[in-house]
Amino acid sequence: MRAHSTVLMKKTIKIYDDFSSLSSLVDVGGGTGTALAIIIAKYPHINGVNFDLPEVVQNAPSYHGIKYIGGDMFVEVPKGDAILLKCILHNWSDEKCIKLLKNCYEALPNKGKLIVMDSILPINLQTNVHAKYAVGMDVIMSAKLEGKERTKDEFETLATKAGFAKFKIISYVYGLWIMEFIKSV
């Protein structure tokens, strides 16, 4: 995942400039901090929190501007101006996603945003590379885990059930869509 995060995030910071307005960013399920380190290298004013299981963060390398916190995202999520969920929601059932999203909602200030990066399944049969990737990932997630890939409408439903006021799709980067769930408008 480290190599995937490096390639993905280097492209993401070129096309998604909303990180510039943040003073703090929490990467939930951030592994060893690769994605957050790339963001903070471009935006050094951001106070980064890399949040993952205790056994993951205890062995993470030290990056400037990143604090590591171990915990369980289904119990509580650290507070921040924004929260990043990259390739996380597709691992879990709708029920677990709603629990996680509610925890993220509680950790955000008014007008805070959750930045979600995940595949979006097409509604109609498509043969383009984006659709093939999403469908292939859906088969893998369904077979190996309790998760699944979701359509735009399914993501919007999860956001609404967790309390978010607004859902929008921002851009596409290497197989993943950048989405924002806004706490209040």
Segments and roles (model prediction):
Residues 117-162:
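C-terminal alpha-helical "lid/dimerization" subdomain adjacent to the S-adenosyl-L-methionine
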Residues 1-117, 121-128, 176-177:
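Conserved adenosyl
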Residues 7, 153, 182-185:
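Repeat-unit-sized solenoid/scaffold elements
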Residues 163-185:
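Core SAM-dependent methyltransferase catalytic element
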Residues 87, 145, 168:
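Short, flexible active-site loop motifs that bind/organize anionic cofactors or intermediates
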Residues 62, 160, 165:
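Short polybasic/polar patches that bind polyanions
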